[in-house]
Design a protein with these regions (language model features):
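Conserved acidic donor-binding segment of nucleotide-sugar-dependent glycosyltransferases
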Residues: 280-287, 296-301
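A charged, aromatic-enriched C-terminal amphipathic alpha-helix characteristic of glycosyltransferases
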Residues: 16, 301-331
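Helix-loop-beta element that forms the nucleotide-linked donor phosphate-binding surface
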Residues: 141-142, 148-149, 154-174
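Conserved donor-binding/catalytic core segment of Leloir-type glycosyltransferases
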Residues: 4, 147, 174, 181-199, ...
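Membrane-proximal helix-turn-helix segments that form the acceptor-binding/catalytic region
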Residues: 57-60, 64, 87, 116-146
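Acceptor-binding helix/loop patch of EC 2.4 sugar-transfer enzymes
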Residues: 93-131
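Aromatic "clamp/platform" in nucleotide-sugar-dependent glycosyltransferases that forms part
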Residues: 245
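Short hydrophobic beta-strand element within catalytic cores of glycosyltransferases
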Residues: 262-265
């Protein structure tokens, strides 16, 4: 098959979505398919609307060639893809990432609650949020298939957007092979994320400061670094912490698992049940619960137990497996 992979960002841009797109393209090619990436990233310097039109025109150059299209988001990339594929009658599938409407709502209102509670009550949306809701609904109706990374998000979106369950599929994220770790020389907890509302910064910092009163030696490292640098830091760190309001499929925790490093993650994540046996789950709305988890890892006894748990992790899931699952689904549309 000739498969066009439309993505928001692509290397050399850094970030999980960039890495996912690159690995998917390469894995599809390794299976014998022709795969080409087309990226929205360079157009971000243009105003909203203009950049979407430019991306649509960019897509048209590839549509004479493409037999199938994979859109790796539900709005910025997927809306132009939906129009371009309609003109050429080319099937496309959309892979959901996060929930952009929920994220935007949290940023605007300052309200802080998990994704599971977002669609369960009537909310007053801004004009932008209403537009995002309509755009997402349009894409989900137009797509031949909708690919989720977790059952949790699938369940929420099927109910919220009235998705035909026959169109909804799950392709889990990759969990690559174990990487060698280094013994930590300090009690540093890593929180290298984009500081957006759903990452729950205020509660994390308050909890960490409270835990620091009992364990003054603990350190919170934060910011954003390229993946290569991040891996070096995880390799030698004490623990990884990610008490987000809801991280749907957190690659950050997957990276911690690959290095067999103790971790704290939110209990509402789409991967919470999968990773529960290997780490610590917290209620992201409870500062007390986050404090408890930090203090437990800061203690010698708690850390020894956490190391024992995380070292039992043995799951491996390759991008080749993911590419095979995509290809099998693309054959059906």
């Amino acid at each position: 098959m000739k498969i066009l992979v439309a993505t928001g960002i692509y290397p050399p841009a850094v970030g999980g979505p960039s890495y996912y797109a690159k690995e998917l393209v390469e894995a599809l090619e390794a299976l014998g398919h022709e795969a080409k990436p087309v990226t929205f990233g360079p157009l971000l310097r243009y105003p909203t609307g203009i950049r979407h039109l430019l991306f649509f025109l960019q897509l048209l150059r590839y549509m004479f060639w493409a037999e199938r299209v994979i859109a790796l988001d539900t709005v910025s990339v997927a809306v132009p893809v939906a129009f371009a594929t309609a003109i050429f009658r080319t099937p496309f599938v959309v892979r959901t990432g996060g929930d952009f409407v929920w994220e935007q709502y949290l940023e605007r209102t300052g309200e802080l609650f998990p994704l599971k509670d977002f669609y369960t009550k009537t909310r007053i949306f801004s004009r932008k949020e209403k537009l995002l809701l309509h755009a997402t609904s349009f894409v989900l109706r137009r797509a031949s298939l909708i690919i989720f990374s977790t059952q949790m998000q699938k369940d929420i979106w099927v109910a919220a957007y009235h998705i035909d369950t026959m169109k909804a599929r799950i392709i889990g994220n990759a969990v690559e092979a174990e990487l060698p770790s280094v013994e930590p020389t300090k009690k540093n907890f890593l929180w290298y994320v984009r500081n957006t509302a759903f990452k729950n910064s205020a509660r994390l910092h308050e909890a960490f400061n409270l835990a620091k009163q009992r364990y003054p030696e603990i350190i919170l490292e934060e910011g954003q670094v390229p993946q290569k640098e991040l891996f070096l830091r995880i390799q030698s760190c004490y623990a990884v912490i990610l008490p987000s309001l809801t991280d749907i499929s957190p690659n950050y925790i997957v990276d911690a698992l690959r290095f067999r490093k103790p971790f704290i993650m939110d209990m509402y994540s789409g991967m919470a049940e999968q990773f529960k046996p290997y780490g610590t789950l917290v209620d992201p709305e409870s500062i007390e619960d986050i404090v408890r988890a930090i203090e437990d890892l800061a203690s010698e006894e708690g850390y020894a137990k956490a190391l024992k748990k995380v070292r039992t992790f043995s799951e491996v899931r390759t991008y080749k497996e993911i590419a095979k699952e995509f290809a099998s689904l693309l054959e059906t549309v």
